[in-house]
Structures are given as structure tokens and as C-alpha cells.
A protein has these predicted regions:
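Short glycine/proline-centered loop/turn elements that form peptide/ligand docking sites
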Residues: 18, 35-38
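A cross-family phosphate/adenosyl-ligand binding-site feature
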Residues: 41-53
Length: 187
């Protein structure tokens, strides 16, 4: 079973964090939510409280198939300011394992860590200048090697289905999308 860690910082964007968690779990992926704050309870940018599965200090993360960074502000900024998160992301990328980020996180975190150098990437409008060394695509979802980026809240579903296809397979991703009636929305 594939293993994903999702880092939750105060100020995360609700939809961008929870839709991928939901879709991946429906697809049989082992997803662990991780609080990077001082408490398991993390508050979203819109005041929704989520209790993470573990605290950052409890994680090893070396078994991660994917590290996922939700967007939202100040959530993305809080992720970047956490030295432990930055080390995990850099190590994950250096090992050639998957890293994914959505909204502000591609620029605020991945760009500033040098992970996007020479890659194609997307992000929420206004954060393009932070995609250091990347070619901005303006697409909802962009995949370049082991890095997947997405634009913003509206991209949360296609982003989640792309991650599921990468981790499990396209057939499973399509089945989950059908069961969630996503394909009918896009018709």
C-alpha cells in the first residue's frame, strides 16, 4: 500500500487539503495527516478545525511515497517556516520520490527550496514569481517528473485524481472519480 504524508499548518486551505486526503483514502492509499503546530488540532484559513493523525515529531517520513503540501495562506508560509518540513521535502525530492503542492505552496515552499529548478509548474495566480527556476504553465495541474503542482481550490479534485493515478493506477482513479460523480460535473 502506498504511503502519503500531508502536512497541516495553521491557515491551510480547507478544500485543497481535505479533497486529496478523501480521494486518496477512497483509492486505498495510506494517508497520514501531520500537524506541524504545537497541537494535533490545526485551524484552516476559514476557521475549520482538523485533528491531525500525528504530530510532526512523531513521524519518520522516510517511508513516504508522496509528501503533499496543501496551500492557503498563511498555511503555505507556515510550512516554509518549519525547518523540519523543509528538510523532509528536500530529502524526499533528492531521493527521487514524489512531492506535490497546491495553490501558494508550489511557490512559497517548493520554489524557495529550489525544487522547481528546470521544471514546469503551476500555482495560484500571483505566486508565479516564486516558482524559482520553473516554467509556469497556468494549467490546473502540472506534472514534471516526481513533482506535481496544482493551481488552487478549483483544482483540488483533478489534482487528487492525478495523484491517485500516479500512486495506484488510472483505472482506480477513474473509478473513484465516477463514484464521486466528478466526471458528470465536467461533462
Amino acid at each position: 500500500m502506498k504511503k502519503v504524508y500531508v502536512f497541516f499548518a495553521d491557515g491551510f486551505e480547507d478544500v485543497e487539503a481535505l479533497i486529496p486526503v478523501d480521494v486518496l483514502r477512497r483509492g486505498g492509499v495510506d494517508v497520514t495527516t501531520v500537524s506541524i503546530s504545537d497541537f494535533p488540532l490545526v485551524t484552516s484559513a476559514h476557521g475549520v478545525n482538523i485533528e491531525a493523525d500525528i504530530m510532526f515529531e512523531q513521524g519518520d517520513f522516510s517511508d513516504a511515497d508522496l509528501i503533499f503540501l496543501p496551500g492557503g495562506m498563511p498555511g503555505a508560509k507556515n510550512l516554509f517556516e518549519h525547518k523540519g518540513v523543509c528538510k523532509v521535502v528536500v530529502d524526499q525530492h533528492a531521493a527521487g520520490r514524489k512531492v506535490a503542492a497546491i495553490c501558494a505552496a508550489p511557490g512559497v515552499v517548493l520554489g524557495q527550496l529550489g525544487i522547481l529548478e528546470g521544471k514546469k509548474a503551476t500555482c495560484y495566480p500571483g505566486f508565479e514569481q516564486m516558482l524559482d527556476g520553473a516554467t509556469y504553465t497556468a494549467d490546473l495541474v502540472t506534472v514534471d517528473g516526481n513533482v506535481t503542482t496544482a493551481e488552487g481550490p478549483a483544482a483540488a479534485f483533478p489534482f487528487a485524481y492525478e495523484l491517485l493515478a500516479q500512486l495506484v493506477d488510472k483505472k482506480t482513479s477513474d473509478q473513484i472519480a465516477e463514484g464521486m460523480r466528478f466526471k458528470h460535473l465536467m461533462a
